Amino acid sequence: RATINSMFFTIPTIMTWTRIVAIPLIIGVYYLDSLKVETQNLIATVMFVLFAWTDWLDGFLARKLNQTSAFGAFLDPVADKFLVCAALLILVHMNRVHVLIALVIIGREIAISSLREWMAQIGAGNSVAVHMVGKLKTTVQMMAIPFLLYDGILFGSIDTRDWGAVLILIAAILTIWSMVYYMKKALPEIRARVK
């Protein structure tokens, strides 16, 4: 019988929890008035990259340590969504991401998360299981956000603002594509229950 610790506090789930804990820390950096904006950007970028890396690490550890669980499978994408959405809100506030792009991405996350929850309740969760396009969307988001947080020139020649703008646009396109994909997968189940 699973204990509370074995469900919620395995090494992989602790790594996942850190992504949620990261949110107020990253936001808090921008309230440290004693730091220059460039320093705030650098710290927030490094923190985001480190915490986003745990998305790969927790999955690797879960398989390596044989500590996969239903709770871990649930928490992992939730932590990703919280981290990405919080970062997008910061970037909108700082005029580094257009509000429409942020609304598309955040709106999709809410819509598909709700769809998945409903499909799971009716026993059809497998029809909207995570697909490669969804994983690609998350990867591009995780690449775009650090560039936009840094907001400067990297290694003397890489303008992270330009790269970030292109990547977040690609992420928005993938966001819409993945939403259409999941909706099409769910449609037969929805129609069957409307009849």
Regions found by a protein language model. Give the residues of each.
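Loop-to-transmembrane-helix entry motif
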Residues: T18, A62, V78-C85, T139-M143
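Divalent metal-coordination and catalytic microenvironments
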Residues: R19, D55, D76, E109, ...
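Short, function-defining helix-loop hinge/capping sites that tune catalysis or transport
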Residues: I27, R63-N66, V84, L88, ...
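Juxtamembrane transmembrane-helix termini
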Residues: V29-K36, L61, L65, H93-R96, ...
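C-terminal membrane-associated helical module and adjoining short loops/tails
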Residues: T3-P12, W17-T18, A22-I23, N41-A52, ...
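Short, amphipathic, aromatic/basic-enriched membrane-interface segments that mark the entry/exit
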Residues: F9-I14, S69-D76
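Helix-adjacent hinge/juxtasegments
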Residues: F71-A124
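Membrane-embedded alpha-helical segments that form the functional core of polytopic membrane enzymes
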Residues: A22-F71, A87-L103, T160-W177
